[in-house]
Amino acid sequence: MSKKLSAAFLVLAGALWGCLSIFVSALSDYGFDSKEIGFIRISLCTLMLLVIILIRDRSLLRVQLRDMWMFVGTGIISVTLFSYCYFTTVINVEAGIAASLLYTSPVFVMLFSAVLFRERITAQKIAAIVLTVSGVALVSGMLGSSALGALDLIIGIGAGLFYSLYSIFGVYALRKYSSLTVTFYTFLLGTIGFLFMTNPIAIIEKTASNPVVIPMEIGLALFNGLLPYLFYTIGLGHTDASIAGVLVAVEPLVGCLVGIFVFHESVNPAKLIGIALILSAIVLLNIRLSHKSTAKEIPA
């Protein structure tokens, strides 16, 4: 696959994820909470992808038991917990703020890489952390009178934390398995994770009593679950994880635009500056300094 095509997949994935709040807010209006919405999304994605694999190549379902830790990581630790945190923030706060807090994830990737892979923490990376923290403060309203509650802020940043883990575990999984296999078992384990948090029977009853939500649920699973995860996983398999993080950074921009134009959320200079700082940190983390750079490195 060409680099341009893989880049296009990553950008498209980010754009689709940026529209997530449309379906989340619609289902929330019909009484579904964040955990129920997460279960609907992941379980339907699992069924859709299972049908595709059964038609295309059943051998894609074969994995070794000793590798299941990878899918526990991408599915339960990442997708389940990320979905809960992100949907909760969208419902309780604003779509734009939720999308912006989500993109603290590259900082977590950097920190995990320093601990797990012994990558060095440079002055460049520290500057990115400062930009991110400042951006989060501005976007969340911490520096103004309309500050987020501490719990909302923690949950919003938690979405960024768990989102970052998909890249960490995903890289390991893609070394052995195809993008379809990785995505399917991610969804399957994510569904299992939500079973401990929801009552599927109650969700079915709630859906049956309001059939109008069925197209919303299918749209949520297809356009904000199956397609973007497939696009992202395919792109990640042909692109450096750090570059992938930059390309999908269109998500908070799309998310904020959805918040402003669809939900008529307020916009102010502080929020715009905060978004710009977070995106600047993402770009800064991925600028390749020349070998002649005088940037100081701080051992992790």
Task: Please identify what each model-predicted range represents.
Residues 1-40, 145-172, 297-300:
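Glycine-/small-residue-enriched transmembrane alpha-helix faces in small-molecule transporters
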Residues 4-12, 36-52, 73, 126-131, ...:
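Hydrophobic alpha-helical transmembrane segments of multi-pass integral membrane proteins
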Residues 8, 14, 40, 79, ...:
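Helix-helix packing/entry segments at the starts of transmembrane helices
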Residues 18, 76-80, 84, 107-111, ...:
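Hydrophobic/small/kink-forming positions within alpha-helical transmembrane segments
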Residues 42, 141, 213, 249-300:
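C-terminal-most transmembrane helix of multi-pass membrane proteins
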Residues 48, 53, 86, 105-130, ...:
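C-terminal transmembrane-helix exit sites in multi-pass transporters
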